[in-house]
Amino acid sequence: MEKVEAVTVSNVDPYRRILNKVVSQLLLDKGAGQASNHSLETLTQMLQALIWEIGNSAHNYCELSGRTMPTVGDVSLALINMGISISNLDPYMRKETHVPIPLPPQQTQQRPLSLLQAGIKAPHPHYVPSYFPPMPDPHAYIRTPTHKQPVTEYEAIREKAACQKRDIEKALTKFLCKTTETNNLFPTEDNMFPLIACKPAFPPYAAALNPTDQVFDFEELEYHYLVANRTEDEPSKDDGEEGDSENEEMDGDKSKEEKPELDIKPNSNTNKAILENPNIDNPYLRAATLPKRSKNCPTPGTMPSRSLATTAPTIRTPSTLEITKTNL
């Protein structure tokens, strides 16, 4: 038996290709060794139209009987209506020389490259058809919490509590050393090893609530009272005129030396501090001082003095009227 020549099918429909193979196999069974392309396409088209008509008629008989799925009886009625004998189908099926149609080669499905795939994709559930797209990657279902999980280990909790307690005690000690009186552990360095003075105050929270920028205690109030009531002697004024400017300088030096100082009795710690440190940082508590007068500037309220040696007698100049009268 001659082999049928290979025929190229231009159509890419897979069902059309299967029908083309069926027609070629039937031609081989009947002894046809060769077939042209046009005849093979014509026979394929005729077989396709026959199968379509059989299926359409069987569907109509099925709906006429009130059913949705056709049965063997519906197909038999469709064949009989088209004039095809059913009795010849049984011996044709039992024919031993029948050559089966080879199955189409199974093509290996190319797996899509999942470069960013994490994990194994979950299969479809039973109610999802297989032709649906695959499920997403497992990382798409990961739920990332936005907060940190609390630490529940016993050792970590105790260590954290101990660190917090140590930091609180250290900060409180530094705060008390800067705001209250302290004792020095060693006499060399004052700020190396400070100790909090054991002087309880009542109530203890009053020191923290009161402002500490300027504290007015009784000693400072006493000093403020002394400065406010302080009086200074005015410098002596000369009624007459002095002979020279040198005498003015000598008298000015004597008046400065004769100014009495403020008598402050060292009866308190504040007065001692005043005597030791006369310079006061607070400008409002500082004693008022008179501005220094220069050598050439006169004292306010007095006329400038003139020496007799330097002053010359004034000569009156005659007017033009007097000159004319004398000439006449």
From Swiss-Prot:
Residues 252-264 have a biased composition (Basic and acidic residues). Residues 16-83 form the Histone-fold domain. One of its GO terms (cellular component) is transcription factor TFIID complex. Keywords: Nucleus, Phosphoprotein, Transcription, Transcription regulation. Residues 239-251 have a biased composition (Acidic residues). One of its GO terms (molecular function) is protein heterodimerization activity. Residues 229-309 are annotated as: Disordered. This is Transcription initiation factor TFIID subunit 8. It comes from Drosophila melanogaster. The lineage of its organism: Eukaryota, Metazoa, Ecdysozoa, Arthropoda, Hexapoda.
